[in-house]
Amino acid sequence: MRTPIALSLALCLSLFPSFASAEEAAPEGEGANKPVYVDLTPALVGNYGSGPRLQYYKADIALQVADKDAATKVEHHEPLIRNQLIMLFAQQTDQSLGMVEAKESLRQEALKQVQQTLEQEEGKPLVTDLLFNNLIVQP
């Protein structure tokens, strides 16, 4: 009874290194296609809206790019990207920052502006998506 169990265990252990190396090789091949995220740090903080009372926002934003080369180019243009986003946020109202649908619309507009800016500077949009990691407003 012990012999079949020991034999099965030995067989499993002998095959384990080949399974382990196959699993390790897969991420390397997939790594070339994985997107890279560029966090805009520090978070964007400013005021928005018009009127006698100041309203503030804080936005933690990440930009999705295709690879590390694109990430390097995006990081180089980060001051210009931050400026575009700050100007966009300054134009917002309570309605455009208060509702989920409006925030999605703002996210899409922010992505479009970042892509246009990079298109002008690099000849390609480079950024495939823009994510709000955190968006806090104080109306």
Name each model-derived stretch:
Residues M1-P139:
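Flexible, low-complexity charged segments
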